[in-house]
Amino acid sequence: METVLKNDCSHCQESVILRENGGAGRSSNTGIQHDIICVGFGPAALAIAIAMRDRGIQRRVRFLERQPEFGWHTGMLLPGSKMQISFIKDLATIRNPRSHFTFLNYLHQKDRLVHFTNLSTHLPFREEFNDYMKWCASHFNDWVQYNQEVLSVTAVESTPGRPAEYFKLISRDVRSGELRELSANHIIVASGGEPAIPPILSTQHLPKTVIHSSTYLGSVHHLLQEKNGSYRFAVVGGGQSAVEISEDIQSRYANSKVTLVTKASALKPSDDSPFVNEIFDPSSVDKFYSLDHSARQQTLLENKATNYGVVRLPLLESVYEKLYRQKFLEPNPAKWPFRLVTGREVMGLKELPNNQIELQLKDTLSGRVESSAEVYDLVILATGYTRNPIATMLKPLEQIVEAPADGKTYCTDRDYRLRFRQGKVKRDAGIWLQGCCESSHGLSDSLLSILAVRSSELLDSILASSKRAEDHARL
């Protein structure tokens, strides 16, 4: 049941806000409808839902997801692309190999287990792993509301001047624009990353022919519809996504020309050797968190080659082979279907009258800025993601969040709980952050590797924080 309220804020655009009523089992604290609200329903949130189901944890829980259905990096589910981690690091196995929600049980349910075994691989196709997660998500439709974008989270004081007792969220239906108000004692922010646009471009309106890699699959066919068209593409970035997109373009558009632009001096291989991979073990989080700020920064820099701006070696070797073959088949570089431009940073762009794009490129050694040698029909920014919820939905809490001395806008405890200033929020209410704690919890924070274990750690923390008299739930 919902109550329709008018937003009577005199300096705001008038809108209708729907306030959810808690119904049966409502908390005795006035206005609190849910025990847990999770913002987002991607892999991190899904792992939490699975852990709750596996452990039999009964809570009034709601997941709010802005997408119309579950999807994992749908803009980058390139045909034939494979996972970069073992299927054993799924959403449940490391925590509980007997869970209904393991990847192996998914294969069993889909009658593909034996056939998958015949592949002799630990690396499923990304399309299949996405389907596995969609299968998991289908078990929680009663917990999830899709098409809901959370706009803000505020702390609510029942008594002015006293610590806040719970949190209020405002979400917007992305289809109708309708606003909804919800409340809970415990908030989990697992909304994923936002596309990172190079700073020099983020201040200007980007033409429709400049897209981020996150929307690649959904955009490329819409923008460039002729499969045999002689299109020119620029892909900006030097990591796995940038190279994969460059390869995919050439398979989709046989007559295309692709230029891969990276500010690095060369494409570099990722380090996925066994000893280095131990930094993604769940137990490594404790060690990393115990370090001081300087040691954390040093460790992140030292292990950067595992995850950022790097390419898996087989793909890198394939690209080099392709470049070499071009050279002996055609001595004129202007006729090559694929070019690699290193040591160049995008400093700006110009939209031409025919919707083509000219890039302004800076030589990273000399500092000289020049226009690109070609103009492009489509520019794809494979420039990663940014994660800072304090700058978006949690901004109303900015004044009561404890800010660390290292210049960050927030800090978290080992259990991923956002730290508030003393006396601002009661201990039996809290906010937990997922996927945006790399600087305090290590490189694995935004990856799939530790989701199964981390989800259970987070639930332990939430259950331990709840001290309401009527809530005696145990693990």
Curated annotation (Swiss-Prot):
Source organism superkingdom: Eukaryota
PANTHER family linked: L-ORNITHINE N(5)-MONOOXYGENASE (PTHR42802:SF1), MONOOXYGENASE (PTHR42802)
The protein's name in its UniProt record: L-ornithine N(5)-monooxygenase
Needed cofactors: FAD
Disrupted-gene phenotype: Results in poor growth under low iron conditions and loss of siderophore production. Also leads to a significant growth defect in human and murine macrophages and attenuation in the mouse model of infection.
Keywords: FAD, Flavoprotein, Monooxygenase, NADP, Oxidoreductase
Upregulating conditions: Expression is induced during iron deprivation. Also induced in response to reactive nitrogen species. Expression is regulated by the transcription factor SRE1.
One GO molecular-function entry: ornithine N5-monooxygenase activity
Protein purpose: L-ornithine N(5)-monooxygenase; part of the gene cluster that mediates the biosynthesis of hydroxamate-containing siderophores that play a critical role in virulence via intracellular iron acquisition during macrophage infection. SID1 catalyzes the conversion of L-ornithine to N(5)-hydroxyornithine, the first step in the biosynthesis of all hydroxamate-containing siderophores.
Pathway involvement of the protein, from the record: Siderophore biosynthesis
Record: residues binding substrate: 89, 277-280, 307, 449
GO biological process terms on file: biosynthetic process; intracellular iron ion homeostasis
Oligomeric and partner information: Homotetramer.
Organism: Ajellomyces capsulatus (Darling's disease fungus)
Catalysed reactions, as listed in the record: L-ornithine + NADPH + O2 = N(5)-hydroxy-L-ornithine + NADP(+) + H2O; L-ornithine + NADH + O2 = N(5)-hydroxy-L-ornithine + NAD(+) + H2O
InterPro entries linked to this entry: FAD/NAD-bd_sf, Lys/Orn_oxygenase
EC primary class: oxidoreductase
UniProt: FAD binding residues: 65-73, 84, 150, 446-448
Cofactor note: Binds 1 FAD per subunit.
Pfam family, one: Lys_Orn_oxgnase
Enzyme Commission code(s) on record: 1.14.13.196
Signal peptide interval: none
List of residues binding NADP(+): 238-241, 307-309
Protein family (similarity comment): Belongs to the lysine N(6)-hydroxylase/L-ornithine N(5)-oxygenase family.
